[in-house]
Amino acid sequence: MPLEIDEVQLAAIATSRALGIKRNTSKQMDQFMEQLGEYGIIIDPVADNEWLHITKAMCHNRVIRMPESLYTRICDGEPEAIFIFFHELGHLMLGHQTYLHYSDIEPTQQEDAEWQADEYSKTILSKMGISYMPEQLNLRFL
C-alpha cells in the first residue's frame, strides 16, 4: 500500500507512544522485546547455526525471527541491530504482507515496503536518540 513519509512517521510515533519508547529504551531492549508479547508480538531468536542467513531477520504473522547473535546485539544496544529490529517491527505495524512485485514497472518509493520499514525504524531510533543511516538493500530478481 502506498504511504507517504509523513504517514510512515506518524505510524512510528504512534507506536513509540503506545509502547512507551523513550531515550533509555536502547539500554533495556531485552525488557522491551519481552513486553511485546503482551501485544501478541513474539520475538523468536533462532540458533545461529540454524539460521539460513539469507536475511538479517524476518517477520510473519506477528512473529519476528532473528539469529541469536542479532538478538544479543540488540540487547547490547548496538544501533545497527536495533535498527534491524525496528525495521521488522515496522513491517508488522504497517501491515505489510510478503509478496513479490510482479510488474515490469519498478514500484514507486511510496509503494516500497522496505523503504517504508526503513523510514519507520529511523523515526523510532530518532526518538531514542540514535542516529543511524542504513545501507538500503535492493533485491533484484531476474
Language model features with spans:
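Active-site hotspot residues in diverse enzymes, especially metal/ion-binding acidic/histidine motifs
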Residues: 1-142
